[in-house]
């Protein structure tokens, strides 16, 4: 079961012409071509997006410890004794 031979391709073409008509075939081929072109463009855009995301990763922000937060809060509010 490999590629169809020339005679088999002619039979397939004849069936397609009978099913869709000679006028519809160019429209179908054009639609298929546009679909393939759009698919390839979206795949390229997806690859570009992943490259941009990986290149633009930022360094993680520093997480303050509870002691640092407490010392900042205590310096902001005056203590009353």
UniProtKB/Swiss-Prot annotation:
Region (Disordered): 45-81
Record's keyword terms, sorted: Cell inner membrane, Cell membrane, Membrane, Protein transport, Translocation, Transmembrane, Transmembrane helix, Transport
Gene Ontology BP, a term: protein transport by the Tat complex
Pfam families in alphabetical order: TatA_B_E
Topology relative to the membrane: Single-pass membrane protein
Family: Belongs to the TatA/E family.
Subunit architecture: The Tat system comprises two distinct complexes: a TatABC complex, containing multiple copies of TatA, TatB and TatC subunits, and a separate TatA complex, containing only TatA subunits. Substrates initially bind to the TatABC complex, which probably triggers association of the separate TatA complex to form the active translocon.
HAMAP family, per database record: TatA_E (MF_00236)
Protein name as annotated: Sec-independent protein translocase protein TatA
Organism expressing this protein natively: Sulfurimonas denitrificans (strain ATCC 33889 / DSM 1251)
């Amino acid at each position: 079961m490999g590629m169809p031979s020339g005679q088999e391709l002619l039979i397939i073409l004849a069936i397609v012409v009978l099913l869709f008509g000679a006028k519809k075939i160019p429209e179908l081929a054009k639609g298929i071509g546009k679909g393939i072109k759009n698919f390839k463009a979206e795949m390229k855009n997806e690859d570009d997006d992943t490259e941009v995301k990986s290149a633009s990763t930022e360094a993680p922000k520093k997480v303050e410890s509870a002691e640092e937060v407490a010392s900042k809060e205590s310096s902001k509010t005056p203590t009353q004794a």
